[in-house]
Amino acid sequence: MNKVLIITYYWPPSGGAGVQRWLKFAKFLPEKGWEPVILTVDPEYAAYPAIDSSLVKELPENISVHKTPATDWFRIYSSDKSKVPSAGFAANPQNSLKGKISRFVRGNFFIPDPRKGWNKFAFRKACDLIEKEKIVTIVTTSPPHSTQLIGLKLKKKYPGIKWIADLRDPWTDIYYYDQFYPTCISRKIDSGYERKVLKRADRIISVGSLLKELFAGKLPDIRNKIDVIPNGYDEADFKDIQPAELSGFTITYVGTLSDRYPLTGFLDAITELRKIRDFSLRFVGKYPDSIMEQIKRSGSDEKVEFITYAPHSEAISYMVNSSLLLLIIPEAGDNKLIITGKSLNINSELLPVAFTQEKLSM
């Protein structure tokens, strides 16, 4: 069986959306004749936005997982380790002077991101695995986009290796990029990294056709080496979940919420809904105080439940046991590039969905 080295920062016990894609690929790759070899960061050194220890149980039996230390650059500009940013943390920026300084430091002194503190450790271990395991194919998946620089360096050392760069999100075009206050020099450096990765990778994977077009427009003659492999869902995640008898009409949102997510139209709609029927509203995921205040101002706080974080299986259970699922996309000029993974799980359940962007009609 051919071996493929998968270099990924997010791996169980990391929680959140970023871990799901390659956890599932690693499960199914052996069916296609590929043995995955995982290289990831040791959780003791990692800066994860969330922990989901239940995902450890989903690891394929006998899978080879190699972990290395990392330098935790987040400690340098964040005194509160409990508030480790997720990939989209700037979507809910702290507008205090301290928050703005923190984001400026992040955007101009840690390019492309602070998780690059893992790179030197990962590179050394990757070289060891490539040589000992006779690996000729590697995959780097991002965000964090600093992981792609590991592949860039490996390709330089081993020109004959096949390097596949999996880009789940935009890089310098991500909707919250400007909230790091990057200088012209910082933008140039970061864009340079992005173009080098796009140019030197043997194949590029994106999660959607619009994202493919975005990357294809960065350089001439790279379109033909960009493939689209969408996210999906695993039927096994649903087989042991039995829908319960609902006591009333339940609306559920699962995932991140921030001030960039347009809730006004939805809250206006449920204000009208309250006049004609009883209902309950449930948010499962991280949310700032401002969201709570917005809901309180709408008069809906008596019927709302906030669950700060739930393991993946529990989050799916909340979705299954709902009357209506809410899907919200952040307000941004390029939000068409946002392909939320939860939409695949929503589709798998064939439940009614209320979608909000700027306005919601129910």
PLM feature spans:
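N-terminal subdomain of nucleotide-sugar transferases
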Residues: 1-74, 203, 209-212, 273-275
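Membrane-proximal helix-turn-helix segments that form the acceptor-binding/catalytic region
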Residues: 32, 124, 146-149, 153-157, ...
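A conserved catalytic-core segment of Leloir-type glycosyltransferases
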Residues: 41-120, 129
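Short N-terminal targeting/anchoring amphipathic segment
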Residues: 94-96, 110, 122, 126-147, ...
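Carbohydrate-associated surface elements
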Residues: 210, 229-232
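Conserved donor-binding/catalytic core segment of Leloir-type glycosyltransferases
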Residues: 244-261, 267-268
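Nucleotide-sugar-dependent
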Residues: 261, 311-318, 325-347, 352-362
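Nucleotide-activated donor-binding/catalytic signature segment of Leloir-type glycosyltransferases, i.e.
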Residues: 285, 290-316
